[in-house]
C-alpha cells in the first residue's frame, strides 16, 4: 500500500494575507452598518447635512412656496427681483398657486414640493396645527412665521348695480345681500330692470379658499351682532343655519381662488356677477382694468370685518432640510424689506412692515378713493377657535356644499 501523500499547508505569509483580508471585510461591513440610515428621520438629517454641504460650496438650493393667488403678481415680481441678488441667484424659488385651505391640505398630505405655506390669512392655522399633530405628532410644523401684508374683506359691485341696490335697500350688508338673493323676480323686483336678470353674488369655496371661509365667518358674526368669541352655540343656532343656508343657495360661483373669482368678474362683466366678496387687495388690483371693460366698480366694506394677514410659514416638515428653511427665511427677510413692501401697495396690500406708510401721494388708497376705498375701517372681528371653524365648514359642506 502506497503511503498517503501530504497536502501542502499554508505558509506563514499566506496565513497573514488571509487574516488581513477577513479583517478588512469585517471592518467594512461594520462601517457600513454603523452609517446605514435606520429611519426616515435619519434620512432627513442626512439630506439636511448634504444640503448644508452643498450650500457652503455655493451650490443652488430649491424651495417651493404654496401661496394664495391674491399675492400672485406681487410675489412673481419679488421672485424676479430676488434672483438679481447674489444670495438670490443660489436660491431657486418655485411659486405654487393654491387656495389657502388647499395649500394646508397639500402639506398635511406630505406634498414635498412645499417648504413654505403662505395662505391669505391665519384663520385656518390652528386647524392645520391640530391636524398635523394628529397625523405626524412630534415638533410643530412651523419654525418661523411673519405677516407679509394686510387686507380686509370687501364687497365689490358694478357702479350702476350698486346705485340701484342702495336705492332699494339703503346699504350693502349681508342682511341686504340676503334679501336681494331671495328676490325671485331678481332685478325686476329690486330696480325695475328685468334685463339684468337675477341678482348674482359670488364668493369662493370655503373649504378650499380662505376668502370663502372669511365670508362665512363674517355672516355668522353679523347675524349674531358680535365681533369676538364666535362659539359653537352660535354656529349651531337653528335661526342662523336657516338664514345662512338660504343665503348660500343663492351664491352663483364657488371658485377655489379669490384672484380667479375677481378676474372672472372683470372678464365677463355683469352677466357673470353683480357683486363678489373678495379681499380689498384683489379689488384694488382690478379697479382700473374693469373701468376700461364694463364701467366702474364700487368697493364696500362690511360693518364687521376681518384682517387677512397673508402670513408666511416656514415649514419644519420631514422633507424640508435646514438649508431649505434658511433659504426660505432669507426670502422672507427680502419680502419684508421696505422696497419690496412698498411694491405690495401697488397691488393693493397694506404693508406688513409698519415702517412703510399707506397714505402718501400716488398711493392707491389716495388715487382710488372715488371707488370707495377707505383706510379707516369699522369693527374688526377676531378669529374663532379651531373647533368653531371646523364645525362651520362641516355644516356648510353638509347643507349646501359640493364635493
What is each of the regions a protein language model found here?
Residues 2, 6-11, 15, 36-197, ...:
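N-terminal segment of the mature folded domain
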Residues 192-224:
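Extracytoplasmic/periplasmic solute-binding protein
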Residues 82-86, 111, 118-121, 132, ...:
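Sec/Tat-exported extracytoplasmic proteins
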Residues 214-300:
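Ligand-binding pocket segment of bilobal, Venus flytrap-like solute-binding proteins
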Residues 72-79, 101-104, 122-125, 129, ...:
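Extracytoplasmic/secreted envelope proteins and their assembly/folding machinery
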Residues 2-17, 21-32, 37-42, 56-58, ...:
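Extracellular/periplasmic juxtamembrane helices and adjacent flexible linkers that interface
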Residues 160-167, 208, 224-230, 318-328:
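Short helix-loop capping/hinge motifs at secondary-structure junctions, enriched
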Residues 142-155, 240-256, 291-320, 324-325:
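Periplasmic-binding protein-like
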Amino acid at each position: 500500500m502506497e503511503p498517503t501523500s501530504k497536502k501542502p499547508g499554508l505558509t506563514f505569509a499566506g496565513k497573514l494575507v488571509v487574516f488581513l483580508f477577513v479583517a478588512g471585510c469585517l471592518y467594512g461591513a461594520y462601517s457600513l452598518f454603523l452609517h446605514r440610515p435606520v429611519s426616515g428621520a435619519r434620512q432627513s438629517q442626512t439630506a439636511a447635512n448634504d444640503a448644508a454641504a452643498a450650500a457652503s460650496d455655493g451650490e443652488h438650493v430649491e424651495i417651493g412656496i404654496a401661496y394664495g393667488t391674491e399675492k400672485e403678481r406681487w410675489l412673481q415680481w419679488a421672485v424676479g427681483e430676488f434672483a438679481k441678488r447674489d444670495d438670490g441667484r443660489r436660491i431657486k424659488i418655485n411659486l405654487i398657486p393654491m387656495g389657502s385651505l388647499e395649500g394646508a391640505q397639500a402639506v398635511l398630505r406630505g406634498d414635498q414640493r412645499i417648504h413654505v405655506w403662505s395662505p391669505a390669512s391665519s384663520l385656518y392655522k390652528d386647524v392645520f396645527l391640530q391636524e398635523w399633530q394628529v397625523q405626524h405628532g412630534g415638533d410643530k410644523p412651523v419654525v418661523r412665521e411673519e405677516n407679509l401684508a394686510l387686507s380686509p374683506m370687501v364687497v365689490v359691485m358694478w357702479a350702476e348695480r350698486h346705485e340701484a341696490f342702495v336705492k332699494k335697500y339703503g346699504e350693502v350688508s349681508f342682511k341686504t345681500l340676503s334679501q336681494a338673493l331671495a328676490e325671485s323676480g331678481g332685478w325686476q323686483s329690486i330696480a325695475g330692470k328685468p334685463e339684468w336678470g337675477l341678482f348674482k353674488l359670488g364668493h369662493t369655496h370655503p373649504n378650499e379658499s380662505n376668502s370663502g371661509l372669511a365670508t362665512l365667518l363674517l355672516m355668522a358674526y353679523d347675524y349674531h351682532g358680535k365681533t369676538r368669541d364666535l362659539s359653537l352655540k352660535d354656529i349651531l343656532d337653528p335661526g342662523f343655519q336657516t338664514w345662512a343656508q338660504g343665503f348660500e343657495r343663492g351664491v352663483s360661483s364657488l371658485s377655489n381662488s379669490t384672484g380667479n373669482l375677481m378676474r372672472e368678474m372683470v372678464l365677463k362683466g355683469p352677466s357673470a356677477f353683480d357683486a363678489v366678496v373678495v379681499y380689498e387687495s384683489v379689488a384694488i388690483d382690478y379697479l382700473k382694468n374693469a373701468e376700461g371693460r364694463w364701467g366702474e366698480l364700487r368697493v364696500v366694506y362690511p360693518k364687521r370685518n376681518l384682517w387677512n394677514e397673508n402670513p408666511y410659514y416656514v415649514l419644519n416638515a420631514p422633507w424640508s432640510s435646514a438649508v431649505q428653511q434658511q433659504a426660505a427665511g432669507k426670502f422672507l427677510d427680502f419680502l419684508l424689506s421696505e422696497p419690496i413692501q412698498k411694491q405690495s401697495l401697488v397691488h393693493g396690500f397694506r404693508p406688513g412692515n409698519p415702517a412703510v406708510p399707506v397714505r402718501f401721494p400716488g398711493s392707491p388708497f389716495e388715487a382710488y378713493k372715488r371707488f370707495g376705498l377707505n383706510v379707516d375701517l369699522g369693527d374688526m372681528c377676531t378669529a374663532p377657535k379651531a373647533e368653531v371653524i371646523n364645525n362651520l365648514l362641516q355644516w356648510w359642506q353638509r347643507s349646501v356644499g359640493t364635493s
